[in-house]
Amino acid sequence: MNIIETITKSDKNISDNTSNIQRISLDKLRTNPIPNNKNEIWRLTNKSKFNRFLDFKFTNDFYDPDIPGYSNIQNICRIIIGENKRIKLKRENWEIKELEEKEIQNFLQQKIIKSDTTQNWSNLLNHFLTDNKNIIGLNISGKEIPPLEIICNSKNNFLNAKTLIINIEEDTIVSISQINIGDKNSALSISSYFNIAQHSVLNHGIISYGKNKANIINTLNVWQHKNSEYNLGSLQFEYDFGRLEININQVEGNAKTNIKGMQITNNNEQISTYANIAFNGPNGFLDQLNKSLANDKSHSVFEGLIIVPQ
């Protein structure tokens, strides 16, 4: 497996351009190169499909995605991760600006340095693979913000990795769509982080669709503060191997979370969703619904865990 060999090989073969985040992630992965399938969140994973995901040759090169639909949609801000375009949009009522590289590195280091290697294996793999040009960090504030569309894509015969970090300031309302596009016979690793401040609302849609023999591991990490609202709708289909890991933390309680998910499988595909919702304070609200359509010999998996304070 190409990726596992890269993890376990000598430090002498690691590039001098490797970032501190990549080195920390690599050190942690070396203690647990492959997740233990006895762990609940990995127990039902199809081993042969997972191994195939890890066997792709990795690249950080950018490829123009084949985006379906209209190419010039009015009043939508489209961002393609890896395109290397500067982002700074400001109007009277709102602002979207990039986080500084140091802010991004400090944030990621804080999140991964004490992370459990099994529960956070997918994030660690992503951060080991992703270089700086495939990481986007945004700070969003205000109201009447036009919808954001964020594109991640993989390239035929390669594994690509992308990271997204978004901080949503207080009293902000925003709608964000993530479109994950898997080219045929490819693999895509995505880690997304959203910090939602007090009295803010994030309407979040995720559409992940692939072509023949496409693969994806997609992790979503959300922190909600008091009186915030997070509304997630997700759709996954046409992936030979697809995995969505949702981790939501109501940091102080008193927040509202709505999750609606749909996954569609055919032939011998496997698509899985794992949702972990933590309430670290009183008066939290959760409404969660996940639906699956599984045809032929395919497998559709959903597991949910709710953690409440003692």
Outline where the language-model segments fall:
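Glycine-rich and polybasic anion-binding loops at the starts of cofactor/ligand-binding domains
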Residues: M1-N290, V301
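C-terminal structural cap/anchor segments
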Residues: N290-Q310
